[in-house]
């Protein structure tokens, strides 16, 4: 999987599934956690948190791609 493929998947899902009270980073984190199970490893092991810090979404997705491709 490439970064662009994951980004497209996540942002497409965000358009139809994100609750209005979620920030973008919350949705990205929860989506990745549910679909791929790597969000917590990226947050805690890699130290990249987009759940609380929306500005980290790009770095978070990059780290997720690396972990997804290692599976």
Place the predicted regions along the sequence by residue.
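N-terminal acidic leader/helix
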Residues: 1-29
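Generic detector of leucine side chains in alpha-helical contexts
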Residues: 3-6, 34, 61
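Surface-exposed polar/charged interaction patches
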Residues: 12-17, 34-38, 67-70
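Acidic, low-complexity, intrinsically disordered interaction modules
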Residues: 18-58
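Charged low-complexity stretches with an acidic bias
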Residues: 52-71
């Amino acid at each position: 999987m490439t970064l662009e493929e994951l980004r497209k998947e996540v942002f497409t899902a965000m358009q139809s599934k994100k609750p209005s009270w979620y920030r973008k980073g919350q949705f990205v984190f929860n989506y990745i956690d549910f679909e791929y199970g790597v969000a917590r490893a990226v947050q805690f092991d890699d130290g990249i948190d987009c759940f609380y810090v929306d500005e980290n979404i790009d770095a978070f997705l990059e780290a997720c791609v690396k972990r997804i491709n290692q599976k």
